[in-house]
Amino acid sequence: MSHSVNVGLQKLIESGLPVSVSVIFPGPWYQETVEILKRHPSVSVGIHLTLNSEWKNYRWGPVSGRGTVPTLVDADGYFFPSAEALYRNRPDLRQVETELRAQIERALRSGVKIDYVDYHMGTAVIYPEFRELTERLAREFGLGMSGYFGEAMQSPQYWAAPQNKGDSLVALIDRLRPGFNVVVTHVGIDDAELGALLDMNTANPLPEMSKNRQGELDALTSPRFSEALKTRDVRLVTYRQLIDMQGLKSMRRPAG
């Protein structure tokens, strides 16, 4: 998403934790992300299908070009900050397909192995017609879909205060049920770039974004987290490994 996030990502990868990394390919810093991932081919890489741009003063637009998908962008040519704002603009589904296809093709051209797709802010699967389109594209390109392998999605540490994120992650490990669980994390470093980000979708955005993302990085790379995994006999696997174990044909649309 940004240079600060990429620095945090590299630190997480170098810690040795098996991770799956979802890339915002319309984002300004995606090429740096790709460079990092090329140095670490064991990392499972996904496309964070993106139809929104939510950060004040730090925005992105379509890979396919603003003039190609005019119903997906605001007056300034950027993605709308929320799924609701996009839907109010009555997006042309053909343009949604054009853009998602462009993101997938950019990812495949990048030179890193792409294993799966997931969904920035959930928008690519939030409406029935969007979900059906995303499913069709995943099948066409032979990609896994996050949430389609029976995984339980977890991210309780996101809203915990920076100093409490370690406690939140350990508590999550302690209550995990048998099966596949995805812990959705957002890492970064505590610097001015990341600290300036404000979510436009709420009057009460998560404060001190840089400290929160540094807190997640610190929690994930802490000896305490590693010990909790060992104590509970929790095995970390990537989406690449999950797909290898279950196969793409095992994918099922999640209930609800």
Labelled PLM ranges:
Residues 5-6, 56-61, 130-131, 158-165, ...:
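Histidine/acidic-residue-rich catalytic or RNA/ligand-binding cores of hydrolases
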Residues 9-16, 30-44, 61-74, 109, ...:
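Acidic (Asp/Glu)-rich catalytic clusters
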Residues 58-87, 198-209:
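Active-site gating loops and adjacent loop-to-helix segments of metal-dependent hydrolytic enzymes
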Residues 134, 142-144, 170-195, 237:
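Aromatic-lined glycan-binding groove of carbohydrate-active enzymes
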Residues 145-148, 202-256:
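C-terminal domain-boundary segment and adjacent tail
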